[in-house]
Curated annotation (Swiss-Prot):
The keyword Metal-binding does not apply. Residues 1-24 form the signal peptide. Residues 25-51 form a propeptide. This is Conotoxin VnMLKM-04.
Amino acid sequence: MLKMGVVLFIFLVLFTLATLQLDADQPVERYAENKRLMSPYKRRAILHAPREQECCEPQWCDGGCDACC
């Protein structure tokens, strides 16, 4: 009877926990697949957007932009 309890514990508890862990990984896989299917132009725009900063003239700069001109 003890062996039957151990087998039931393994299948009902541990197997359930293992499948729940796999479910948690699916959103990341979907996000990676969505990025892979995106056109190269859109991917480039996403990658360059954080690096883009507003340029301003040095005499008008208030710290909210870079003096890159």
